[in-house]
Curated annotation (Swiss-Prot):
Belongs to the universal ribosomal protein uL23 family. Keywords: Ribonucleoprotein, Ribosomal protein, RNA-binding, rRNA-binding. It comes from Acinetobacter baylyi (strain ATCC 33305 / BD413 / ADP1). This is Large ribosomal subunit protein uL23. GO terms for biological process: translation.
Length: 106
């Protein structure tokens, strides 16, 4: 998997109360990912980008809501989230994401 595809697959971390509790108790990190990304692509992207061992990947797709903008009816985009379980004792620091992006550009 090339570096460009890694950054297409992983869109960013999810910051929520549930994600924080899972990260602290079960060693699970939550990421927003590309809607077409497969579990294998997500696993390889996290392992390569953060240098950790991934045990399993669970994904969910949240359908976008219909919203009104004045007279027009719009729709929010669907979002795919990946719950990535890491090997015991390993953790992903979100500061690592910025460091890796800078080193990949060099």
């Amino acid at each position: 998997m090339n570096n460009e595809r890694i950054y297409q697959v992983l869109k960013g971390p999810v910051f929520s109360e549930k994600a924080q509790v899972l990260g602290e108790t079960a060693g699970v990190q939550v990421f927003k990912v590309d809607i077409n990304a497969t579990k294998l692509e997500i696993k390889k992207a996290v392992e390569k980008l953060f240098g950790v061992d991934v045990l399993k990947v669970n994904t969910t797709i949240t359908k976008g809501k219909s919203k009104r903008f004045g007279k027009t009816l719009g729709r929010r985009s669907d979002v795919k989230k990946a719950y990535v379980t890491l090997k015991a004792g390993q953790d992903v620091e979100m500061a690592d994401l910025g460091d890796t992006a800078e080193s990949a550009a060099e």
